[in-house]
């Protein structure tokens, strides 16, 4: 019928469900009726705004697979071509998320070493905090393990913070005029960007 709606259990808002925002419902919908939210218009508006500086980060998985969606062979879809395309679209600065992933790993490693020094005052094992879907899964399904999660930001969140501090300082940019954009392979990253923590 024309009044049919699709929603989560008991029509609860998504933030009150156990949904991890993994996107599997989108990939497995037999008729393709479900779609992710597109932020393309917001991105293009930021690029067109002369008062804004757009800084984009590219996830490693995107870097290796971006050409498939436009019919390029693996050998043709190089990082150079991707950067060139992003520059032609109008992005001001382009970074690889590998940079902030290294920072996250160093942060988690330091935290782990601190935990080792004071074993009795920390919960074990220590879990990574890199994936927002994983974080949400632990918080909703196994809240007793929330204290086991690393306090380090994910690579995406780490880069967002660095783009408004270190990179802004190095490039002489006003942090309030920076629009940090992520090109990621995972829908839970959109959820992560919306979480105020």
Explain the meaning of each model-derived region.
Residues 36-197:
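Iron-sulfur-associated redox domains of electron-transfer enzymes in respiratory
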Residues 1-2, 11, 61, 99:
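Short, ordered loop/turn segments at secondary-structure junctions
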Residues 8-18:
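Short linker/helix segments within small regulatory modules
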Residues 1-9, 158-161:
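Short, charged low-complexity linear segments at domain edges
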Residues 9, 33, 149:
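Short, flexible active-site loop motifs that bind/organize anionic cofactors or intermediates
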Residues 12, 22, 79-80:
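Generic non-transmembrane alpha-helix signal with a bias for helix starts/N-cap capping motifs
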Residues 8-9, 23, 66, 143:
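General secondary-structure edge motif
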Residues 1-5, 18-42:
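Iron-sulfur cluster-binding cysteine motifs and their immediate structural context
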């Amino acid at each position: 019928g024309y009044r049919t709606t699709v929603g989560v259990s008991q029509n609860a808002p998504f933030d009150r469900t156990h949904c991890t925002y993994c996107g599997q419902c989108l990939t497995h919908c037999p008729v393709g009726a479900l779609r992710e939210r597109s932020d393309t218009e917001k991105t293009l508006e930021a690029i067109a705004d002369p008062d804004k500086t757009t800084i984009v980060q590219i996830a490693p998985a995107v870097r290796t697979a971006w050409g498939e969606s436009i019919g390029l062979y693996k050998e043709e879809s190089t990082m150079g071509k991707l950067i060139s395309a992003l520059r032609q679209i109008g992005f001001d600065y382009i970074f690889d998320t590998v940079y902030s992933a290294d920072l996250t790993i160093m942060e988690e490693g330091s935290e782990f070493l601190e935990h080792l020094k004071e074993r009795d005052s920390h919960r074990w094992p220590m879990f990574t905090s890199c994936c927002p879907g994983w974080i949400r899964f632990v918080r909703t399904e196994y809240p007793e393990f929330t204290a086991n999660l690393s306090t380090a930001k994910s690579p995406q969140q780490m880069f967002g913070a660095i783009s408004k501090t270190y990179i802004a300082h190095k490039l002489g940019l006003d942090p309030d005029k920076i629009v940090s954009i992520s090109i990621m392979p995972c829908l839970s990253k959109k959820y992560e960007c919306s979480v105020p923590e």
